[in-house]
Structure formats: structure tokens, C-alpha cells
Amino acid sequence: MSEKYLFFDMDGTMIAPGTHHILPSTVEALKQAEEKGCHAFLCTGRGYGMALEYQDEIKIPGVVFSNGAGIAYEGKILETHDIGQETVKKMTDLITALGGGFQIIGVDYIWQNAKEHRRFAERFPIEYPDLSEEEVFARKAMHLIDEYHGEAIQKIDFNFDSELTADLFFARIPASLEIVLSGGYYANLGRRGGELMKEGMTKGYAVKRVLEMFGADSHDAYCFGDSMNDMTMLQVCGTGIAMGNGTEDIKKSADYVTNDADHDGIYNALKHFNII
């Protein structure tokens, strides 16, 4: 039997929405898959540093980060596709002028403007009641924009208070950037939030690159996701699996819909396809 390649979105897929924990059944499923010779990758909108938040639990060797703009394996960065510094400044200045929140994401750290920093600070006590605000920001490698000193950036996240303001922003996004609406931490914002990467950078692109690197066929790839930034990877892999808690669009595009992320969705899907 050919080796299988497993790609997992994080927030809303591997990490149950609302609980911010990885289920024991998911940890067990990953262990069994590894024992069977499967190659597992996180495939996330998070930066590399933030993607490692749960690495002690899951020990996955591969990480596709920043929605496909970077690939790492066994602790080594294999490639990144950076947004030019001039474009980063132009976009963040525009978001600020329109009253929006943003965070710019590099390999190791995330830098946020004050509005975005407050938005996360307000949600952390609910999501992580046992940790202080400082501990959570450190855990997620998040810093204020004042601490940014020109590091390479792979992704820009943005959000606005209204769709009208967002539309003004969309009209001024250059063709050199790829845009994905409402994924990951922004999945509940509709058209008011999204993510920007270098043109052509998507999770689907990165899945294809990983398969090329390993000399593998897309038929042997299984991709798990729950929101719009997962759409491209579900389309390029042999089997696209949507979580039961996923958006209607992602479920319609999937080959299979499993249980919710917090109801053993990953474990049950891997069982269904006889991977474990």
C-alpha cells in the first residue's frame, strides 16, 4: 500500500472551536497514523511560531504555515514566499487609515496594531481562563507592532467594523496579493475579515509542493478543513474531508463530511478511510 499524506487545518479542525484543546482521540489517531507510516502535516493560516503551540502534544513533523506561504519539515524551513516590505507598509497603512485591525505574520512572530491586540486580549480570558494575558500572548508569539523591526512577512490578517469599509479596502488590494476571506481566527467575520498572501500562495499550492518534494501522488493525500482558507487544499488532494462544524461551502466541496472537531471528527474520518 502506498504511503499516505495527511494535511490538517488547525483552528476549527484539529483544535476544537471554543475549547482550544486537541482531543485525546485526535492525538491517538495521529499516533496510529504515524505507526502506519503516514506523513502528517499541519496546514494552517498561523505563522510557523504560532503553529508550534501544540507541538508537544501532537509531534507532527510537517508544517504548512501562513496559508501556504511557508513550508517546514522536522524543524527546518524549506521555503517561504514573502510579501515585499513596501507592500506590507502600504497595506497596513491603508488598514489603519480605514480604522481596521491587522496583524502581520512572519516565521517566528506575529505583530499586531493596537486594535487587533485589544481584540485578542478581550477573547483570551474566555479561551484560556487559567493563563494570564501575558502568558497567552507569549504562547502565541504575538507582539505589538511597535516591536516590529523589518522581519520578513508571509501574511497580513485584517478585519474591519463594517462590510462597507472592507469593500473600500478590497478595491485597493494590488494584484500581487492573494486574498482569502473568513478563515481561521477570522471565520466568524464574514466579509469583514480576511488574509493576504503573496499572489498564488494558498494551502492548495503548498499541498502540491509538499507532494512534489516527497515524490507523492495527490491520490494519496487526505486534507482536513473547516473554513474558506481550506478550500484550495481540499480541491487539490485526493480526498477532501470537511469537519461537521465547517462552513456550508466547505462541506459542499468536500468528498466526505466527518463529525465535528469536538466529536472525534479526525479520528472517525481516519477510521472511515482505513488509514488507522
Question: Where are the model-predicted features located?
Answer:
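Hydrophobic packing residues within well-ordered alpha-helices of enzyme cores
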Residues: A51-Q55, F169, I250, I266
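Short, structured coil segments at secondary-structure junctions
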Residues: I58-K59, N67, I173-S176, V236-C237, ...
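Mg2+-dependent phosphoryl-transfer enzymes with acidic/Ser/Thr/Gly-rich catalytic loops
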Residues: M1-Y5, L23, G194-I276
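Active-site phosphate-binding/coordination module
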Residues: H21, T26-I126
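Conserved acidic, metal-coordinating active-site core of Asp-based
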Residues: Y109-F224, M228
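Asp-based phosphoryl-transfer active-site loop
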Residues: K4-T19
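Short hydrophobic/aromatic-enriched beta-strand-loop microsegments
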Residues: I60-N67, I179-V180, G240-G244, T258-N259
